[in-house]
UniProtKB/Swiss-Prot annotation:
Sequence ranges assigned to domain RNase III in this UniProt record: 7-135
PROSITE patterns per record: DS_RBD, RNASE_3_1, RNASE_3_2
Gene behind the chain: rnc
Organism classification: Bacteria, Pseudomonadati, Chlamydiota, Chlamydiia, Chlamydiales
Annotated NCBIfam families: RNaseIII
Assembly notes: Homodimer.
Keyword rRNA processing: yes
One GO term (biological process): regulation of gene expression
Positions bound to Mg(2+): E48, N121, E124
Family classification: Belongs to the ribonuclease III family.
Protein name (record): Ribonuclease 3
Keyword Calcium attached: no
Gene Ontology molecular functions: double-stranded RNA binding; metal ion binding; ribonuclease III activity; rRNA binding
Organism name: Chlamydia felis (strain Fe/C-56) (Chlamydophila felis)
Catalytic activity reported: Endonucleolytic cleavage to 5'-phosphomonoester
Enzyme active site: D52, E124
Amino acid sequence: MNNLINIKEVEAKLKFTFTQPQLLVTALTHPSYRNETVTITEDSERLEFLGDAVLCLIVTEHLFLLFPSMDEGTLSTARAALINAVSCCQYTDALGLGEYLLIGKGERIQNERGRTSAYANLFEAILGAVYLDGGLAPARQITVPLLPSKKDILPLMLGNPKNRLQQLTQKQLRTLPVYQSTPWISPQGAPGYHIRVIVNDEIWGEGFALSKKEAEKLAAQEALDANDYKDKNTVDL
């Protein structure tokens, strides 16, 4: 057992007690840490593979039951947004598990892309470990509370907010939105982006994020919300 990991703390955050705690240790072991530590023989990659499938099943079932009249194409769009790397990274952050990741000294996760990838893989690996140890029920109990509310899933079903905003401005105003970027520093001191979306020389929305792509999406969504835009393909809530 790795003495660097406080198993009880992680279990408390998950609200799940492992009968095979070594599974949790393996899930927390990044491949780079195994490569740099001669006493470690297993890393998280196989558990990530399993956890990815478990997450897909849980989210699929959740959406299927939540929206009984929704077609499979729209459900697939929402599912893709709920299981992508950005979402899985957010699940890790929500659970407060990032600090327990065992990662090699040579592995860089300071930048947003590296952090997102590492934390997303961590969530999937932990979910795989929980599934192996306790089955689908505890994996579901961990995952479902992390998912957005029914109301917040609606924008995911309608697609990328940038595309929706462009469709709106083209149809109603015969113009395209313009995105202006300026540097931004997060409260934690990390460099990021402040994006303003401009339509007909007016600021429609703003977004702040560590990645430019995410900041643009947030700005577009704020613009849509401010203009009370509703897609034709609405979902009954």
